[in-house]
């Protein structure tokens, strides 16, 4: 990828950063990719597409150190759980065998595993060596008859967040728009004017949480044409250009896809969240409004009233235990505000939230939820997090796995909220699961013991 192409990806017109006196998202600084490179960002964005073979072209470490670190669930194929790599070594680089190894790897994968498509991820070594991925992809596609698509996001291009952009850009240019959607089944109970097709962008089905939302959409006569990329299928993503509306779930990752689909196909979109009762209801209302169906609006309101009543009833045993509790939330992106909303729905107070991967719009939503004086943490080293905990007397820390031992060493209750978690927190059912996990975490009998003297002292 050329330098001007990278700069074009950094300059995102739909991003709130562009309204400031700078061009798009900030360029990476030396050493700033230590927490995740562009390759990692591209791979983690597309890896949930379950029927595609994801082939990493590079040394074994690039695949082995990053594979399957997002807990996206699949309702069907599990080909994406297999790690494929060309395993380039020193001799391959010296002898210039990278392109040949790549071609034979694609042919072997197609012959043995029969994927819907093959995605090839570029990494630093072949990018510096100058391997022509596009030429190899064209030759392999001709030889196998299966779509072979290059994802050019070598690690040294920039940060993990930058890597999301080329992955989405390739989907718009090479995948979406290549197939027409299947007709609605004849057994459907909805009249033609009540049927609506939508697309989901940046929804990754962590721990299967979108399966809490899918039945609600089915009940309303809303079909998800394609999801980019949670529980996704290659053929379904190809049909997303026919969606009547798109919902953007994580703006930092794939806002360029939502903007491009609006420009190319006129598809309206909005950014929403399924974390918490209020956010889920708002998302359903916004979908109904974008689809412009008065009957759908009425049915949506009836469904929301029913689900909110059921959720409130299920939350009663947990609310008293959580009301007034203080939490430090250190995450990023859409979760920096959407989880705040969910915790407030439970009667909790968020003393501070992390904004390391948040956009300006995310920060504005945080201020709307927490007030203008909201504490936002750009950096989250252990000392900073614990200082906030002690200053505001937080009852627990809610963050990603890398902060777990910071909390445990401070004898502080900890709940994992990031992509590695095993529990689904989205939707009306998810908020009940979140409340249960919070109560079990805070009320664990281990915490009083950690603060008491050992019996032999």
UniProtKB/Swiss-Prot annotation:
One of its GO terms (molecular function) is nitrogenase activity. Signal peptide: none annotated. It comes from the Bacteria. PROSITE patterns: NITROGENASE_1_1, NITROGENASE_1_2. One of its GO terms (biological process) is nitrogen fixation. InterPro entries: Nase/OxRdtase_comp1 (IPR000510), Nase_comp1_CS (IPR000318), NifE (IPR005973), NifE-like (IPR049939). Pathway: Cofactor biosynthesis; Fe-Mo cofactor biosynthesis. Keywords: Nitrogen fixation. SUPFAM superfamilies: Helical backbone' metal receptor (SSF53807). Belongs to the NifD/NifK/NifE/NifN family. This protein may play a role in the biosynthesis of the prosthetic group of nitrogenase (FeMo cofactor). PANTHER family: NITROGENASE IRON-MOLYBDENUM COFACTOR BIOSYNTHESIS PROTEIN NIFE. This is Nitrogenase iron-molybdenum cofactor biosynthesis protein NifE. It comes from Klebsiella pneumoniae. The gene is nifE.
